[in-house]
Amino acid sequence: MRGSSVVFLALAAVGLIAMGCRPNESGLSLLAECDFEKGGAESWQPNDPAHWRVVNDGGSMVYELTAAGEPSRVRAPTSWSLWAGRDVASFEFSGRVRCQTDPATVVRDMCIFFHFQDPAHFYYVHFAGSSDGVHNIIGLVDGADRIKINAEPAGTSIFRLTDREWHAFKVVCDAETGEIRAYLDDMTKPVLTARDRTLGRGLVGVGSFDDTGAFDDLKLRGAGK
């Protein structure tokens, strides 16, 4: 390889690192990030555009879900907005989330979607204000009503979505092993874990089962470009 080519590749590698493409500990590189500061959400595809908007929240632009969606033929989350073109297998999806429903509603929730293939086939992490067999779970929708797939027994998973404050989240999936981990606030210890390979890949997204809230500072890491 010519010396000039070596220099070019070295500079390209440095450029990728400067752009945020450095692989993390799991070997996943930054594929996309979105902070909504330009005031739009062109990269997002909501199931009901009338229920989503970008608003100024104390000087920061955020992506807000303003109303619950309509129930479908299967029991599943009613509102989602998918990150267009972000079809991944193994990934790390992180950001900030806030539930805006009255905290007195203990079953309030916000959801993180992944491996979304169509409205009847996807996974979701259900961060909630209480824990039982259907709240604060990792759920699978596979052509039928959602089922709980996380390992934590019903009612024992750690729930933290009990206020109207912002919470940091992270969802990690290893498509080869089926391992899924969901974190809220504490990025070192997952609150929900599962192992399932029913759906191998798909889009990621944000939303809720039947509540309102907002999202910001979203980042997606995965394999490839």
Give a label for each model feature.
Residues N24-P49:
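Extracellular carbohydrate-recognition regions
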Residues F36, L218-L220:
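Extracellular beta-strand elements of beta-rich domains used
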Residues R53-S79:
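Short carbohydrate-recognition loop motifs
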Residues P71-G143:
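Secretory/extracellular carbohydrate-interaction modules
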Residues S79-R86, G155-L161, G205:
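Beta-strand-rich interaction surfaces with strong enrichment in secreted/lumenal proteins
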Residues G95, R164-A175, I180-A182:
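Short tryptophan-centered beta-strand motifs in secreted/extracellular beta-sheet-rich domains
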Residues A144-A168:
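Short, aromatic/His-centered strand-loop micro-motif at the edge of beta-sheets
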Residues L192-D216:
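Flexible glycan-contacting loops in extracellular carbohydrate-active proteins
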